[in-house]
Swiss-Prot record:
HAMAP family: UvrB. One of its GO terms (cellular component) is cytoplasm. It holds the Pfam family UvrB. GO terms for biological process: nucleotide-excision repair; SOS response. Forms a heterotetramer with UvrA during the search for lesions. Interacts with UvrC in an incision complex. It comes from Salmonella arizonae (strain ATCC BAA-731 / CDC346-86 / RSK2980). The lineage of its organism: Bacteria, Pseudomonadati, Pseudomonadota, Gammaproteobacteria, Enterobacterales. Residues 633-668 form the UVR domain. This is UvrABC system protein B. It is found in: Cytoplasm.
Amino acid sequence: MSKPFKLNSAFKPSGDQPDAIRRLEEGLEDGLAHQTLLGVTGSGKTFTIANVIADLQRPTMVLAPNKTLAAQLYGEMKEFFPENAVEYFVSYYDYYQPEAYVPSSDTFIEKDASVNEHIEQMRLSATKALLERRDVVVVASVSAIYGLGDPDLYLKMMLHLTVGMLIDQRAILRRLAELQYTRNDQAFQRGTFRVRGEVIDIFPAESDDIALRVELFDEEVERLSLFDPLTGQVEATVPRYTIYPKTHYVTPRERILQAMEEIKDELADRRKVLLANNKLLEEQRLSQRTQFDLEMMNELGYCSGIENYSRFLSGRGPGEPPPTLFDYLPADGLLVVDESHVTIPQIGGMYRGDRARKETLVEYGFRLPSALDNRPLKFEEFEALAPQTIYVSATPGNYELEKSGDEVVDQVVRPTGLLDPIIEVRPVATQVDDLLSEIRQRAVINERVLVTTLTKRMAEDLTEYLEEHGERVRYLHSDIDTVERMEIIRDLRLGEFDVLVGINLLREGLDMPEVSLVAILDADKEGFLRSERSLIQTIGRAARNVNGKAILYGDKITPSMAKAIGETERRREKQQKYNEEHGITPQGLNKKVVDILALGQNIAKTKAKGKGKGRSTAKTGIVELDMTPKALQQKIHELEGQMMQHAQNLEFEEAAQIRDQLHQLRELFIAAS
């Protein structure tokens, strides 16, 4: 099923890219465990990584620090590798409230979560791709270090069907029930099956638009065909097919029975400890809750909160790392850590926060001590599991630099010839008035300005002051959700306003070629927001414009400022020298404004199979761009209802047309959530 990686791009590597690609590939072939790609803003880091993947033909996991950047990378990788398996693996919760206990007020908070079905399907698709083929790029968030079902048990549970195989209908239905598929002869949807005489239709859990029809003759599989679950049209017949479990957490019956005995043993030991410490209430609470869970597991094969017993279900010892997405990645896989200066510290912090909450639950009798082993990976476990790694950042952290040693690959020269911004340091005393005159100069020539302050109060006061002086200004703060933030950025690019004021939200991954000036107020106040890395990242926001400039307001030059200015000047000199040697004139980027939000548009085109290309499909792509996630979800439910109604009325063309709209909306929802 695997194909070779085939890179689809109209451009050839240029600038520093060819040298960076060569050095990274040589390092990987020489067996280097850690390398760092120091790539400046706009130098085409993703394109460099895509070239490395295509040349070395190795399955790859790309870790991003948040869902927004993961969605952006997924869209880019999907365009680079349209013929290969580019998958998306992020948390499937739209909303998640973990189980917790607050001793001070004696308050127990039940686990409450809302699962996004489309993202769940994409997660299942990602693990299936890793198990079945080698031409895989999985773009994941830090969700990848959280516990997932054991790949060995997952593989054991799969149902393999081949034409000519002897198996009776009841055996197939029993196996489907074990895989947690449910029978539904009326509404045929993901993770269900229906039976009509000797024909079984199965809608695989990891599939979005293809179902399997199993035709039996007596006790023999006569034909296997793939069909469109909406129209019923047969797409192809296949000699064999593998049905994967409906969830990553499915467990064979014998393993559940064995786990139940181990849980009973642990419960008996824990009860003795609690009674010895005179904790009668905790002992009663724990017994009651655990007995209830055991009863459910015995009857149904699972229970609410079954993940708390994952250590027993996967057969691991106390303290052993949980199975994660890394266990599904082949041994010769490649790991790319994007924006590594943010992602690496995130990975380190996940375990401790989770541990503190669970220890309280164990202490007060809500959970058995084994629940502590349902956790994300510790940092040292992540290090042990990670395959050969490339860290990608414009400002690599100390960890990456230490691990890479001399293997820091510079990618400073941009293919467009754009230079790093000119930096000026100006006094604090006149910073606001000076900024106002700079803004007015930019507004006249239709360019935008980013201003970063140290405090929320100052950002609010500055916004108010600029508004009073007739400037079109908006304020970006932490209370604004991801989608609204994207809309503000889009409006800035479209020229709805000229100035965007923020605190710490104007750093990684913002792509705005229209911004020609970045103003950093109080740049001489040494600290987290004015560290060398923060300054370089913020200055980099003006690096996509031909007239890029950064003004640092400060009365003295701090060590961080000196390092940031020195590094920016080093890069600028190297870029200028390259341009002179090769006769390159810097060109401004001409990136379409809708690109930020329409991350899924091209993806949807590759998924849609040329069906239902009516007017409504084209219209959806534009109209839905500025909808909130809630409105998008509502629209998706509404269209799903319409689609099923058309299918029931045998109006298959209309149903297929709506299905194509749904593809687009779901991709937009991923980008937005």
